[in-house]
Amino acid sequence: MILPPEAHPLANALAFTFTSPTYQRFSALLVGAVLTTGRRTVANVLRTLRHLAPGHRTSYQRVLSRAPWSGLRLGCALMRFLLEHLVPYGPVQLVGDDTVDGHKGERVYGKGRHRDPVRSTHSYTTWRYGHRWVVLAVLVEFPFATRRWALAVL
C-alpha cells in the first residue's frame, strides 16, 4: 500500500508495533479510514479502497480482532510521535474521558450495563448496555484551528 509522503513519519513510528503482514494491512486500513466518508467500519474502508487492498476482507477484520499486537505499545508509540512532532515544547496537557458505547445483541463479548451520565439526571438513572471506554488524549494546538484538539492515544 502506498502511503502519502506526509504520512511516512507516523507510519514509521507505528511500524515496529506490528508484524510485517499485519502492518501492511494496518497501513491500508489507515489510508482507507482517512478516505472513507460515513461510518468507518472495516467493510466501508475496504469498499473505499476496492482493489488497492489485496487479499480477503476477513484478513483485514482480523487486524482488529485476532492479530498479535499490543494496544498499549501502539498507544505509547503514538504518544511518543505526538510529543516529538506536535508538542515539542512547553507543558503537555492530558485529558481523560469515559463513554458508553452501546452494543445490542446476544453475541457481543464483554458487554455490561453501565450508567449513562449524559442521559441520567439526579432523580432518574439511564442505563445502557455495551462497553465503557476510557480514553486518554493529548491536547494539541494546530495553527489552522481556533481551539485545541484532543488526540486520543490510549
Descriptions of predicted regions:
Residues 1-154:
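Conserved, well-structured functional cores that handle cations and Mg-NTP chemistry
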